[in-house]
C-alpha cells in the first residue's frame, strides 16, 4: 500500500476512536459524575439534546468515512431495544442508498481480481451501478460469447467490492475493538450489553460479507434448496 494510503487509514482509525472516546467521556461526565454532585435533574434535562447531537455527529462521520462505519450506523439504527429514538431515527437515514465509488477505480479492482481485462470477460458491462452499498456495488453485464456458451446464459449481475475495502474493514474493526474495550470498563454499560462480544459477532459477519466466494457458495446452496418440493398435506382426506 502507498504512503498516502497508510496515512488515510491511520487518520480513519484516529477519527473513529476519537469519536468513541468523546462519547464515553460525555456519558461519564453527565451520567455518572454530575448526578453524584446533586445535578442529576439538570443533567437529565439536557440528555435528549446531547443524544441527538451525538447521533448527528456519528451520522456525519459515517457518511464521510463510508465503509464499515455505514454498516455500524445501519445496525445501531435497528437497535430500538438498546437505543433511544433520538439516536435510531437519526441513524435510520444511513439505510438509504450509499454514493457509488468511481467506476475507474472499480475497474482496476475488478480486473486485478479476475486476472484479465473486463472487456475479455464481458461482452458489455454497465458503468453505472444498479445498486451501491457500503462494502460493494453491482452492475449489469453480459458474458463474453465463449463464457456465455459455457455457462448457458449471458445476462449477469457483477458484484464488485469497493476499492481497498478489506483494509478499511480491518482498520474499522480495530478501532471498534478499542472502543468496545473502553465501554466494557463503564459499569452501567457493561451490565446492559457485552459490547466486545457484539463487536466480534459484527466482525464475523463483516468478513463473511467481503468473502464473495463464501457468498457464492451460500447462493448455490440456497438455489439448490429451491430445486426440491415437500409433501403437501390434503386436509379433505386427512
Give the ranges of each region predicted by the language model:
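A conserved alpha-helical element in kinase catalytic cores
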Residues: 163-186, 205-226
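Conserved small/polar residues in nucleotide/adenosyl-binding loops
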Residues: 228-235
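Short, solvent-exposed loop/turn segments that connect beta-strands within catalytic domains
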Residues: 146-154
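N-terminal accessory/targeting segments that precede structured cores
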Residues: 1-137, 147, 173-197
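Non-catalytic, low-complexity flexible loops and terminal extensions
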Residues: 191-210
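Glycine-rich ATP phosphate-binding loop
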Residues: 155-160
Amino acid at each position: 500500500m502507498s504512503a498516502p494510503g497508510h496515512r488515510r487509514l491511520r487518520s480513519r482509525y484516529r477519527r473513529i476512536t476519537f469519536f468513541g472516546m468523546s462519547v464515553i467521556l460525555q456519558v461519564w461526565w453527565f451520567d455518572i459524575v454530575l448526578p453524584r454532585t446533586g445535578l442529576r435533574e439538570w443533567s437529565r434535562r439536557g440528555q435528549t439534546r446531547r443524544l441527538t447531537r451525538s447521533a448527528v455527529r456519528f451520522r456525519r462521520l459515517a457518511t464521510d468515512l463510508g465503509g464499515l462505519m455505514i454498516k455500524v450506523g445501519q445496525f445501531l439504527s435497528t437497535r430500538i431495544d438498546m437505543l433511544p429514538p433520538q439516536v435510531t431515527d437519526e441513524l435510520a437515514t444511513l439505510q438509504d442508498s450509499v454514493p457509488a465509488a468511481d467506476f475507474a477505480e472499480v475497474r482496476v479492482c475488478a480486473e486485478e481480481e479476475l486476472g484479465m481485462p473486463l472487456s475479455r470477460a464481458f461482452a458489455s458491462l454497465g458503468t453505472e451501478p444498479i445498486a451501491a452499498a457500503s462494502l460493494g456495488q453491482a452492475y449489469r453485464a453480459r458474458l463474453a460469447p465463449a463464457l456465455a456458451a459455457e455457462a448457458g446464459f449471458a445476462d449477469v449481475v457483477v458484484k464488485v467490492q469497493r476499492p481497498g475495502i478489506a483494509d478499511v474493514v480491518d482498520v474499522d474493526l480495530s478501532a471498534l475493538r478499542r472502543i468496545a474495550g473502553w465501554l466494557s470498563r463503564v459499569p452501567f454499560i457493561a451490565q446492559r450489553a457485552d459490547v466486545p462480544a457484539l463487536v466480534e459477532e459484527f466482525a464475523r459477519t463483516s468478513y463473511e460479507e467481503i468473502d464473495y466466494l463464501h457468498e457464492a457458495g451460500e447462493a448455490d446452496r440456497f438455489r439448490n434448496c429451491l430445486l426440491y418440493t415437500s409433501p403437501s398435506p390434503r386436509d379433505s382426506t386427512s
